[in-house]
Amino acid sequence: MQITVMKGKIHRATVTDADLNYEGSLTVDMDLVDAAGMRVYEKVSVVNVNNGARFETYIIEGKRGSGEICLNGAAARLGMKGDKIIIITYAQVEEKELASDYTPKVVHVDEKNRKR
């Protein structure tokens, strides 16, 4: 039987911008994408710590080292600059193949979205 497990998480990133008129998605600094084992265009769940909003979108490439976390398109209505968010990816795995010591990649960031 397959189960869904957390694959990666960027914890308490600070939203640096919100662009309502952009086509859609979430722009994320590629240093954070790589550190969390995520991929460009991968589906993500986003939780806004400030207002409780939860939504799904996909990642687009942000400039490395920029700390950029931008809510684009309709997602811009669910958060604003300065909000803290959690970005989560999931994977489908065979339950019997999931190692007992499985650990997802979790990236904690500082107030400028630099990996701690």
From Swiss-Prot:
Main localization, broad class: cytoplasm
A single BP term in Gene Ontology: alanine biosynthetic process
Pathway in which this enzyme or protein is active: Cofactor biosynthesis; (R)-pantothenate biosynthesis; beta-alanine from L-aspartate: step 1/1
GO CC, alphabetical: cytosol
Keywords carried by this UniProt record: Autocatalytic cleavage, Cytoplasm, Decarboxylase, Lyase, Pantothenate biosynthesis, Pyruvate, Schiff base, Zymogen
Domain of life of the native organism: Bacteria
Reaction equation(s) it catalyzes: L-aspartate + H(+) = beta-alanine + CO2
Molecular function as annotated in GO: aspartate 1-decarboxylase activity
Cofactor: how and how many bound: Binds 1 pyruvoyl group covalently per subunit.
Listed cofactors: pyruvate
UniProt-listed Enzyme Commission number(s): 4.1.1.11
Biological role: Catalyzes the pyruvoyl-dependent decarboxylation of aspartate to produce beta-alanine.
Protein's name in the database: Aspartate 1-decarboxylase
